From Swiss-Prot:
Keyword check for Translocase: no
Superkingdom to which the source organism belongs: Bacteria
Gene Ontology cellular-component annotations: plasma membrane
Name recorded for this polypeptide: Threonine/serine transporter ThrP
Main localization (coarse): membrane
Membrane topology field: Multi-pass membrane protein
Entry's family note: Belongs to the amino acid-polyamine-organocation (APC) superfamily.
Catalytic activity: L-threonine(in) + H(+)(in) = L-threonine(out) + H(+)(out); L-serine(in) + H(+)(in) = L-serine(out) + H(+)(out)
PROSITE patterns given in the database record: AMINO_ACID_PERMEASE_1
Length: 461
């Protein structure tokens, strides 16, 4: 009898999945990028987070509906392959892989900068290299151990945000750190009004805010390794998005209410200022540590996703079969190792280019358009998924809402965001980089005849 090959193991519990998704979504962008969006929109950035969150909610409910019936590793890439075509499955998997590689390299770069806060003479490539090693060890461990590591990584930044929101509410309503005098809501309407940046500033910020939600769909990547996936994923999809909304909107609300929006960024990080407001003198060091772990957590979640995407491509015969190799611990070791190798090469940019901020901006911005591809694919796949599962949908306990209008509205919204990115000088280049990448992988697909290898699955296979 042939020896059974190792397979991915269902070792992730609900708490692991929820924190993996939170860890991938709430990253350096919230801690370091809040000042940028406030610069453009003023207090109305709050509304931008709420609007973007509503459309992301529609995307997540669409994905949750499919995950309940088909909890497979690779989720939306597999659904694209199955319900659209092998090409779209291929394009989605590579787009998501590219997005997380770009995010991973940018966050590894950021880690080098954060460590220099304590050790200013240290070359930035040294902590970057150490971080790659730590991420590799975490991702090559058994999936349950990986889930535990990421759980505690993500818990650090989640706890920090919760504490900051509580402190901020105390300052706003009870005057903590302000001589007992409540600050109130004056800063939301003063200094130019709620829409201080005008509609142009609001729409510019909205384009950036949408990108900050990328990573929430990581829940889908965990589907093939979740314990009792129908129950676990249904719970995770519902909880994670609400928590992200509360953390993002709550943190930004506290910042723009306590401080005049036009002063944020000029006097340091708003997170540092909030903790310093109540007399925590070590605020800068605390926040630097939190942002360091946030970068590690985001990169860790990203490498998890990258390994599973390469595994899905190999299973669809769009990469060599060797890439689908799974260790005895149930880890897609070949896919993870290849992704870590690219991350290692990318981290060498820290040695070649002396300006870390330039590396961070260029690489991170390149991830925006490829990161949107899975969202479009989820919405389109679900339209066809419904037609293929008419009987199962009738008594489905986790159906998406406002179907199919929510799908069409969300796709229209995403198209508007892309148009807005084109007309914004700060984001136009990232759009071009994304287009070039998508054209390149399409060319590879056609030239190497990968369509001959990637046959579409039958429904229910």
């Amino acid at each position: 009898m042939a020896e059974k090959k190792p397979e991915l193991q269902r070792g992730l519990e609900a708490r692991h999945i929820e924190l993996i998704a939170l860890g991938g979504t709430i990253g350096v962008g919230l801690f370091m990028g809040a000042a940028s969006t406030l610069k453009w929109a003023g207090p109305s950035v709050l509304l931008a987070y709420i609007i973007a969150g509503l459309f992301v909610f529609f995307i997540m409910r669409s994905m949750g509906e499919m995950l309940f019936l088909e909890p497979v590793t690779g989720s939306f890439a597999v659904y694209a392959h199955r319900y659209m075509s092998p090409f779209f499955g291929y394009l989605t998997a590579w787009s998501y892989w590219f997005m997380w590689m770009a995010v991973g390299i940018s966050e590894i770069t950021a880690i080098g900068v954060y460590v220099q806060f304590w050790f200013p003479e240290m070359a930035q490539w040294i902590p970057a290299l150490i971080a790659v090693g730590l991420v590799a060890l975490a991702n090559l461990a058994a999936v349950r151990l990986y889930g535990e590591i990421e759980f505690w990584f993500a818990m650090i930044k989640v706890t920090t945000i919760i504490v900051m929101i509580i402190i901020g509410l105390g300052v706003i309503f009870f005057g903590f750190g302000n001589g007992g005098q409540a600050i109130g809501f004056g800063n939301l309407t003063e200094h130019g009004g709620f829409f201080a940046g005008g509609w142009k500033g609001f729409l510019t910020a909205l384009c950036i805010v949408v990108a900050s939600y990328q990573g929430v769909e990581l829940i889908g990547i965990t589907a093939g390794e979740a314990k009792n996936p129908q129950v676990t994923l249904r719970s995770a999809v519902g909880k994670v998005l609400w928590r992200i909304l509360i953390f993002y909107v709550g943190a930004i609300f506290v910042i723009v209410t306590i401080f005049p929006w036009n002063e944020i960024g000029s006097n340091g990080s708003p997170f540092v200022l909030t903790f310093a407001k109540i007399g925590i003198t070590a605020a800068a060091g605390i926040i630097n540590f939190v942002v360091l772990t946030a970068a590690l957590s985001g990169c860790n979640s990203g490498m998890y996703s990258c390994g599973r995407m390469l595994y899905a491509l190999a299973k669809n015969r769009q990469l060599p079969a060797a890439v689908a190799k799974v260790s005895r611990h149930g880890v897609p070791v070949a896919g993870v190792a290849l992704s870590i190798l690219i991350l290692l090469v990318g981290s060498c940019l820290n040695y070649i280019i002396p300006n870390p901020q330039r590396v961070f901006v260029y690489v991170y911005s390149a991830s925006v358009l490829p990161g949107m591809v899975p969202w479009f694919v989820i919405l389109i796949s679900q339209l066809r998924f419904r037609r293929a599962h008419k009987e199962a949908i009738a008594d489905h306990p986790f159906r998406s809402i406002m179907f199919p209008w929510a799908n069409y509205l969300t796709m229209a919204f995403l198209v508007c965001v892309l148009i807005g990115m084109y007309f914004n000088e700060d984001t136009r280049m990232s759009l071009f980089v994304g287009v070039i990448f998508l054209l390149a992988v399409t060319l590879v697909y056609k030239v190497f005849g990968l369509n001959r290898h990637g046959t579409a699955h039958k429904v229910g296979e």
